[in-house]
Amino acid sequence: MDFPGTLRPSLFKAGPLGMTDGPDLSFMCSWRDALTLPGSQPQNCKDPTLSFAKNLLWEPSTPGPLPLLMPPDPDPWDPGVTAQDFLFRGGHCYQYQSQAVLDVTEQLSRFLWDHGDIAFAPLGRLMLENFRLEGNRGYSKKMTIVSAKKLLQDLGGHQPWGCPWASLSRRLRRFSIVGGPVLSRSVSLLMGKLLHEELAMRWEQLLMDEAFTGGALAWLPGRTARAGQLVYPSGGALDKLYFQEVSVTSGGNPRILENPGHVQLRGPVRQVVTSTVQGETLLAVRSDYHCATWKIDKQGPPALLQVMQVEKGATGISLSPHLSGELAICSRSGAVCLWTPQAGLQTIYKDTETLAFRDPSPWRWADFTAHPRVLTVGDRTGVKMVDIQGPPGCGLLLFRAGAEAACQKGERVLLAQYLGQPGQTPPSLHLICTQFSIYLMDERLPLVPMLKWDHGLPSAPLLARLLPPASPGHPRPLLLGGQGGQLQLLHITGEGTSMPQLAGPPQSLPSITESLSAFPLLEPKKQQLLQERLEAPVIGLAAVPLCASAPGLLLFQLSAAGDVFYQHLRLLQASSPRKVPEQATAPSVDQVSTPSWTPQASARCSRWLEDLMELSPTRPLWVAPTFSHRRFLGHMERQKSQETMPQKLRAAMAKGQLLRPGDLSTLPRAEPPPAPQCSQQDELTERLTEAWEGRVTAWWRRHRGETSETQTQSKRPKRRTQLSSTFSSFTSYLDSPDASSAPRSQDLSTSEARLQSPRVPPSQELTQEVWGQGVKRERRQTLRDHTDKLPLKRDTPGPVATPPSQASSLQTMSFRQQTPVHSGSQPPQKKPRMGF
């Protein structure tokens, strides 16, 4: 823990520059001005690795990474919202490609819930005279009246200006003119402010997604040096943690041993960390609101140790390189917790404010140091060392994004990683990554970077891996991975008391997008799908040093789509320290042979592409979002009803869904309970019975005689003449003194028994009263007395034999009862012959 020999201890300051009892150095713009040492370094401090470090060069075996596994899951991968979906510049052009739809349902529901007084207060003003909510279809010539019904139909496909699908109708223009002063602008102003904040947050998330800081891919060593396990998430939601057995061949190519095992989680996997202490390997996984720890057994499946829930959301985890089982967890609330198998979970640090200056980001990070009881806590403004055994608030600022490190304006901390490794003398170096530079900090010299280098990556470097040297005496490789898939390889020298330095120029490695040339040429739409798949953000990085005669590295990369790619790097023979003299220079790019695609690599890419095309369905065309659900629901119900039962069964079997009885056909309606039996058959009982069974409307129509009226309405004009003559014949028959009353009574009773039911409906009683309208005044009383004496019911419902001579009288009586004839409707007719 001594100071490096190349630095003079008198230059060490106990605090920030300009804040100590020493000379005032606050006027200096950077630490370079304060640490300029005259003279040369001592001869005994010369690093032997610098003599050949400039000749280090790693050569990839292929022009780009190759897919290791087949497309993992049948769930289609959605690339999400891109920068082109937020920005629209230039004129309108027809879109041949499907676009992402910005779903603001969650944001709108939060707005209505949080600001309901502002959102719903102006709606009462729609009842004024300027708006017609549900009016007639008549055309209104008044330009100051807006139809709300037509307006809602226009809003169903409306998009604001600046969108390629924008449209503005006349009614919307009138609504803007009339509704502006009426509805006020409080809703639009508040909604615009919240929408601007949401778009700014989405834009920052596109530039840098901090959820996958640290990487979600890890390598677990196996029983041999050439075998191990890859731990990575997969699936459409990245909620399945896979353990894939991999072995490395003598040529440096990975080989899959068996089908991977997986663990189903409740959320997407954001970070995977491994650590081996005293022969015991632990695995820690971070999700959005949960963290879990497993103990890895080389002979059996992993054993779960603990699952912890983080209420405010976890931002980072780290495993201790000193004590087995220690896990540091950071949350968005500003708290840092330490979990151990013996003591459980305990809070060691909590501060809602940032370290150096105010920054709105809730991101927090924690890692271990060379001392087992000292941790580093970082945010966007700096990194602080905290002693967990000391009083609360005790600590020392290790790095600050400011003038001490010569930071640029707007530069923020993205990653803070401890570079110590178990089994060796623990160094005191820490890696600090920002969006512009990387810094190497020494715990013994806070606030003063040992090394600063501008990496120049176009995307945020959220992944970093420090590897052991390829051979004894070689510098240690440091891999930097950007979120966009860019890779850079650095070499760091400096052990013991020597200062850390960069050995040789940094080297850029091929990215996943450069593997597009290995795939066969496809149709434009499929080619675009493949290109989007290869351009997916990289969320995981792992490296395995190869123990072979020729030093090499095997790199694994995990994309956001769940695809794992690998790449083999080999160290050029000219980089050996034994064969290259001190004056030698690095081989130029022209001298290095350009790698080409081998037939085996092309065949692997073709097989992977075939599986991808089978699993990737065609995305639906973009349609404008609608605010009205009436038409949409009707269309969906009609489309669902047209599907047959075999089609539903095939679709369910293809998706692996569970079918319910209601999915195949309509559910059977529950039968109403049986109506109670009643012995008394009267009008009230029948009406209650029909109402209990739900047929009261049909009973009422039958009761009023509407059913018989509709059946005889078509025959009424044809029978009018016959019925009129029959009524006249019946009247003359009653006036005839030759006819006796007994046969008439028998004929009428027989016709009543045949044509009527056991009870007399009120309709027939009304018909009997109407008979008197067609009879003269002096004969009405006689007809009424005769009809009152007629029997209404018969005990024997069977048919009664009638002599042939009475058939004409029976037919005449039946027709007379059914059709009344109003007086004065037709002139009096002569008495027909034979009584017909």
Swiss-Prot record:
Question: What SUPFAM superfamilies is this protein classified in?
Answer: WD40 repeat-like
Protein name as it appears in the record: TATA box-binding protein-associated factor RNA polymerase I subunit C
* A GO CC term assigned to this protein in UniProt: fibrillar center
Decide whether keyword Nucleotide-binding is in the record: no
Q: Where is this region: Disordered?
A: 662-683, 703-836
Where are stretches of biased composition, namely Basic and acidic residues? 780-796
Q: Where in the cell is it found?
A: Nucleus, Nucleolus
Q: List all Polar residues biased stretches.
A: 738-754, 803-828
Among the record's GO biological process terms, what is one?
Answer: transcription by RNA polymerase I
The main location class comes to: nucleus
- Gene3D superfamilies the UniProt entry points to: YVTN repeat-like/Quinoprotein amine dehydrogenase
**Where on the chain is Phosphothreonine found, per UniProt?**
802
Q: What does this protein do?
A: Component of the transcription factor SL1/TIF-IB complex, which is involved in the assembly of the PIC (pre-initiation complex) during RNA polymerase I-dependent transcription. The rate of PIC formation probably is primarily dependent on the rate of association of SL1/TIF-IB with the rDNA promoter. SL1/TIF-IB is involved in stabilization of nucleolar transcription factor 1/UBTF on rDNA. Formation of SL1/TIF-IB excludes the association of TBP with TFIID subunits. Recruits RNA polymerase I to the rRNA gene promoter via interaction with RRN3.
- Can you provide one Gene Ontology molecular function annotated for this UniProt record? RNA polymerase I general transcription initiation factor activity
UniProt superkingdom: Eukaryota
